[in-house]
Amino acid sequence: MELLQQYLQQQQEELKIQRELHSSGQSQNAYQQQQQLEDDEEYDDDQLPLSPTQTEEFDYDNDYNDEEFYDEDDDFKEDDDEEEEEEDDEMYPIRQDNNIDDDDYEEDEEEQLLYPTNNNNNTTTTTPYTTYNNNNNNDINNNNNNNTKSEMTMIPTVSSNISLNPLQILEQYLNTQQQIQQKQFQKHQEELQIQQLQQNHPLQLLEQYLQQQQQIQQEQFFNHQRENQVPNSNSNSLNSSNENNNNNVNNNNNIINNNNNSINNNMNNSNNNNNNNNNGNKNPFFLDDFIYI
């Protein structure tokens, strides 16, 4: 047991020593990192990169105190203005001045390769943007020495060949929609004309008449079916009334036939009388004529 306790105490002491070493190592590493960062900052302040236009190292503490960088009103002179213009040209390489020398073109040859331009009549196209110039860009491309700067407007291109502004795109869309509506209206008018012609066609009129007659016949048939579905008493009364009506009709027909027979008899009698009269009058006249002659 004593050996075990001694062994455990040794292990605990070793763990304490390792923890102390580990904590001291971390603090030492943090101190070294902080020291390295401070050294790097000091090195960066001492080793600032030179600008392309500088030939010697710039002293930020002393050079701005020189009188040549200040005028009477404590403003920067033309050198600072030129530097600002160069920075603007680097930020906006598409913008060009009208008064550019040939030397500037030679210096900016790499920029021209990075930003190619297509020369049209009144537009200068680049990728992915198109620049519209209010003046004639041919003056810029031909290096005319004008003292005015071209005013550029950046808008996205519609296609690689044709450049349109948003108003032109909207106008084209409205024109296409108007054409589609006109075609639909014309088609609708043609369909209406065809329907009117079909309705006024004689065959169509005949078909309508036949349909109406068919409806009338169907209604009559249904009415007749309803009448046949009446109870027996009513049907007997109807049959008796129909028989009486038929008898009356037959009697009337007999009367008419009798009248016709009487008329025929009268006509025959009148014809016989006329014949008798004609035969009785002929002999005396002939005898008299014969006697007188």
Swiss-Prot record:
Region annotated Disordered, chain positions: 20-148, 226-283
Coiled-coil region list: none
Gene Ontology MF terms: histone acetyltransferase activity
Positions with biased composition (Acidic residues): 37-47, 56-91, 99-112
Composition bias type Low complexity, residue spans: 117-148, 232-283
Name used for this protein in its record: Putative uncharacterized protein DDB_G0272194
Organism name: Dictyostelium discoideum (Social amoeba)
